[in-house]
Amino acid sequence: MKLLISPINKEEAIIASRGGADIVDVKNPKEGSLGANFPWVIRDVKGAVNGRQPISATIGDFNYKPGTASLAAFGAAVAGADYIKVGLYDIQTEDQALELITKITQAVKDYDSTKKVVASGYSDYKRINSISPLLLPSIAAKAGADVVMVDTGIKDGKSTFEFMDEEELKKFTGLAHECGLENAIAGSLKFEDLPVLERIGPDIIGVRGMVCGGDRTNSIRQELVEKLVAECQA
């Protein structure tokens, strides 16, 4: 499992990088689950990491606004993100999801075809009036995206495991692989979740709170990053 860690600034990015993260993910928790940070923060993080890890950037929790989303995705790509990640929040239909991801993918790939698009659904999709993550792999593959993810939409301390069980998450990762996509699991994950995550076998796990001592509003701690890296490699 690759480890994606989500700092909010250059200082945290350096800690995540030194601690051994595989992917450094720039987000802004003040603006939501996949809240977007500023272009200059992405550039600063890119410079601080200096090629040691690829950079991911979230562009927001999006409802059906393909124009706005594609422009945001283009901005993240230009700012230096290697992975551009969008959340499908309050997406009502599969057709809406397909158009949103297709337009984002076109915006990113027209600029640089080596950059990857990550489409994220939400384990608590019923709470946020969106589509099931299990529908996402086939839609994302059709749209030309590279990675599908499941996260929690509402950050109230509840974990992805409170909304999707092990079998559902295994189905999600399996569907992703059948569609030729990488997959990722995130959403208030804890150290005690690692054994079940190993059984599920996602390509990537995404964390913030776990390496902030359990509170995602605190700062990332290098010793917790190193502990997580060691446990993932054990």
Swiss-Prot record:
GO terms for molecular function: carbon-carbon lyase activity. GO terms for biological process: methanofuran biosynthetic process. The active site is at K27, K85. It comes from the Archaea. Pathway: Cofactor biosynthesis; methanofuran biosynthesis. Keywords: Lyase, Schiff base. It comes from Methanosarcina barkeri (strain Fusaro / DSM 804). It is an enzyme of class 4 (lyase). It catalyses: 2 D-glyceraldehyde 3-phosphate = 4-(hydroxymethyl)-2-furancarboxaldehyde phosphate + phosphate + 2 H2O. Its EC number is 4.2.3.153. Catalyzes the formation of 4-(hydroxymethyl)-2-furancarboxaldehyde phosphate (4-HFC-P) from two molecules of glyceraldehyde-3-P (GA-3-P). This is (5-formylfuran-3-yl)methyl phosphate synthase. Pfam families: 4HFCP_synth. NCBIfam families: PRK02227.1-3 (NF002575). Belongs to the MfnB family.
